[in-house]
Amino acid sequence: MSAFVSGGTLPLADRLSAKLAQHRVVLVDGGVVDGLHALGLPLGEPPEAWCLDRPEAVLEVHRGLAAAGAEVVTTNSVGANHGRYGDDAEAICAASVRLARIAAPDAAIAGAIGPTGSPFERRFLFTGQATAAADLQLRIEN
């Protein structure tokens, strides 16, 4: 028996919580970068920059993944850190959240955060990720 109201009228958080409580699958998008490659992102070029340089391509990928059934859409921000982008990292993160929200208004938004700093500096790596996670969480909530 489904815990969902016909037509999906429960709020998104309730729908996702009910699925998780029932140990059901929640569909999370995948392949944002693959989608960008299909639209012309050259191998080796950071995909996060397209949030500012080619936002229409990021929107197209997110819309396609949402149309395919993704209930959770990840931001195109996995490498958007101050080490790589300096002051532009904040603008990229903000744009990645905005684009995901525009493209998939009925989906939950999850921030994608990759490694920061050197893999040899483990303490900084996790501290940097925690800082980035907190910043991205604020952007998603606001």
PLM features: what roles do these ranges have?
Residues 1-142:
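Domain-level signal for soluble alpha/beta catalytic cores
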